[in-house]
């Protein structure tokens, strides 16, 4: 590539040198020419004389010398300044400008043509069926049905496919106003003219049963108005709670994980005047957890660890103050029916009466034995002792087995000795 700036600079330097040489040559030539000034003619009379001689056609040596000097200067000027190069450089500078002008014109025309072609192609695609929605998919919904989400979003088939993701904000606000369970909405263009409506909902914490229908309770403390005829999720059923207590319970249970929440089958309100906010949780593995609403979320975090230590046993896990295990019976089971509790209480009362009767008999027998052990006079004590020793001998002799005697005979002799002693 030619560096045009350097070449132009060299061209200027050469031209300046040539101009200087021309000025020197012209100044030397002017010194030889005659002057019209009369003062100068008086000061230099010899030149006037020479001029007169020239006019008269007389030969002059100085004129010949001047002509020779002019020829020498002209030859030197030809050697130092090359007129061919000067002309060529001028042509090159002009050709450079023409090339730049041609390049700029060609690029501008090319850009305009490309932009015009792009507008034509884009307009054709925008109006063609390739820019129309063919399929709409819904994902992430567990509470709101798919048909309601499609209808509420306002999306329809044959709508413009290009730029559909920019409508996410409009669809998100529309679905949030229609359905309180919707947390956020995202539109995704999946290709092949398919649009995905990705819905994120608030988690359902449990259900409330009213007139054979179930109403979901969300983690954002909202109970939905839409009823369902059956339980379709692994979440507990809330029984016996007022609205304020229900919101308080939902706030606490929202802190539990999905796995732990799925292990709870039912939550019952067992509070009274002495124990407000008292609840019982019926677990899927057969255990029953008793505690308070305010602290149940923190203490249920250790439920799996407690169950692993029980080694398969089931019962009542009390989490009111600390945590301890009890064997389950109808009296400490909040989910037992009144009939079961009454029958179990009757059995307990009967067992208590029997134990009391046994205790009374034992006390009576001990009192009689104490009365029989009162001290007697010495004569009576000696006679009694002799009778006791003799009777003991007889019983020992009778109780000793003899050959040919059976067990029935031995038992009869033992009873006879007991009667004689009495």
From Swiss-Prot:
Biological process terms in GO annotation: FtsZ-dependent cytokinesis
Basic and acidic residues: compositionally biased ranges: 1-23, 62-75, 338-379
Side of membrane Extracellular, spans: 131-422
Ranges for region Disordered: 1-77, 329-422
Chief location category: membrane
Membrane topology: Single-pass type II membrane protein
Subcellular location: Cell membrane
Function: Cell division protein that may be involved in stabilizing or promoting the assembly of the division complex.
Protein name: Cell division protein DivIB
Species per Swiss-Prot/TrEMBL record: Aerococcus urinae (strain CCUG 59500 / ACS-120-V-Col10a)
Gene: divIB
